Amino acid sequence: PPDQQRLIFAGKQLEDGRTLADYNIQKESTLHLVLRLRGGAKKRKKKTYTKPKKIKHKKKKVKLAVLQFYKVDDTGKVIRLRKECPNAECGAGTFMANHKDRHYCGKCGLTYVYQKGE
């Protein structure tokens, strides 16, 4: 079909409505007839996954969580309720978790286990 054909001379496409003299085409000049390709790449199928997505762990939100770590006594003095981790890499303000038999630092893994007599 003519609408899918293109004439090319010297690397340029010849436009409709112009003559060969406009492009300075002489006798014995070579013209290339090229078919125009329409469309793009083939449509890809959507991936189907065999395993369901892993459900991420949601951290429990506790309102005013700071109240667990400090207490203000009658005189107005602030008392720390949790033990701070003494490890240098944790830094100040890193509290250890209170368990029934031990204190545990979640940052560095340092654990203090209670003696049976305590």
Swiss-Prot record:
InterPro entries: Ribosomal_eS31 (IPR002906), Ribosomal_eS31_euk-type_sf (IPR038582), Ribosomal_zn-bd (IPR011332), Ubiquitin-like_dom (IPR000626), Ubiquitin-like_domsf (IPR029071), Ubiquitin_ubiquitin-like (IPR050158). SUPFAM superfamilies: Ubiquitin-like, Zn-binding ribosomal proteins. GO terms for molecular function: mRNA binding; structural constituent of ribosome; zinc ion binding. Gene3D superfamilies: 6.20.50.150, Phosphatidylinositol 3-kinase Catalytic Subunit, Chain A, domain 1 (3.10.20.90). GO terms for cellular component: cytoplasm; nucleus; ribonucleoprotein complex; ribosome. Keywords: Cytoplasm, Isopeptide bond, Metal-binding, Nucleus, Ribonucleoprotein, Ribosomal protein, Ubl conjugation, Zinc, Zinc-finger. There is a cross-link at residue 12 (Glycyl lysine isopeptide (Lys-Gly) (interchain with G-Cter in ubiquitin)). GO terms for biological process: translation. There is a cross-link at residue 40 (Glycyl lysine isopeptide (Gly-Lys) (interchain with K-? in acceptor proteins)). SMART domains: Ribosomal_S27. A zinc finger (C4-type) spans 85-108. In the N-terminal section; belongs to the ubiquitin family. In the C-terminal section; belongs to the eukaryotic ribosomal protein eS31 family. Ubiquitin is generally synthesized as a polyubiquitin precursor with tandem head to tail repeats. Often, there are one to three additional amino acids after the last repeat, removed in the mature protein. Alternatively, ubiquitin extension protein is synthesized as a single copy of ubiquitin fused to a ribosomal protein (either eL40 or eS31) or to an ubiquitin-related protein (either RUB1 or RUB2). Following translation, extension protein is cleaved from ubiquitin. PANTHER family: UBIQUITIN. This is Ubiquitin-ribosomal protein eS31 fusion protein. The lineage of its organism: Eukaryota, Viridiplantae, Streptophyta, Embryophyta, Tracheophyta.
